[in-house]
Amino acid sequence: MTGCPFSLIYSAATTMDQLRASGRVTYQGGLMALRVGEEGDRPWVEAKELRGGRLRRFEADRVFLASGAFGTTRLVMGSQDRFDQDMTMQESVQFTLPFVSMRPTVDPRTEQLFTLNQFNMVVRLDEQGRDLSQLHFYTYNPAFSAALPGGLRWQGARFLTTAVLQRLSFAIGYLPSWVSPRLRLRARPSRPGEVTELRVWREDPRWHRNRTLRRVLSRVARASAPLDLWPVLPELHFAAGGKSYHWGSSFPHSTRASSTSTDTLGRTDRWRRVHLVDASVFPDVPATTFTLTIMANAHRIATGALAEAW
């Protein structure tokens, strides 16, 4: 897939541009954060200029880390010298599954479409709605044509190619992290002025033993006739570990902070004024989209931090 079209969905860059224009924030661009820490009650950030490589140090009353679960985890592990120690991260594993329909649509290559998914399917596996699997459906993308067998890309097979594309859709699905294999992380020291090295690998997935996956595929298959969406099960594939973009829980919230968990304000046991505010602090990762949940939790942490005595 070729990604999301520019400006059709919300981007935090839009809000940031508005804040910069109003003078409410000062944006420091062209920098890469290398380390964070605290000296007394004063947190600091060491960053490197991407042009020239000069190191700079910033101090503040509070530091909020929102580099994405992987970026924040790497930054924290490197800053706390947690090298050659295995850590875990939860992932909502991603799978891809093509579908065919009996009834054709118009030729999708002639439609004014965008590369966002056209519709979603949610498979509920319990009465509470906690165990969910979500599938995002895409009806056409230039990648479809490029992935067709060679015979269907032949100029003389245009009629057959059109017939296939009129009936083909493609789903990207997710399983919740509590039934997905976990990711393993290990940090290695880097040279001075360089970002911490981070090795990532996945536990043995053992898909054939995944009961939740079998239930999801069974539910999807049972809905095939009324929806006219027939899954091509032999073409089920799983993304490599860490490729789902649905990960977190490397420093999950807990009632008491530790070296591997954070308190309800996103602080490990070593820090009082450095707060983790992205998905790295989630207790687990759902199969549904969770960007708004990340934003709401970050807002809650920032509000709580501001309410504390400075």
Residue ranges and their predicted role:
Residues 3-7, 84-87, 286-289:
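Alpha-helix capping and helix-loop boundary segments enriched in small/acidic/polar residues
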Residues 80, 217-222, 298-310:
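Internal hydrophobic alpha-helix adjacent to the cofactor/substrate pocket in enzyme cavities
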Residues 284-305:
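A conserved FAD-binding loop/helix module that cradles the flavin
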Residues 86-96, 105, 239-246, 304-310:
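Active-site-proximal substrate-binding core of FAD-dependent oxidoreductases
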Residues 28, 34-37, 212-284, 291:
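A glycine-rich dinucleotide-binding beta-alpha-beta segment and adjacent secondary-structure elements
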Residues 149-224, 230:
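C-terminal catalytic lobe of FAD-dependent flavoproteins
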Residues 1-61:
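Helical element adjacent to the flavin cofactor pocket in flavoenzyme catalytic cores
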Residues 47, 54, 61-177:
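Mid-to-C-terminal "cap/lid" subdomains and adjacent gly/pro-rich loops that border
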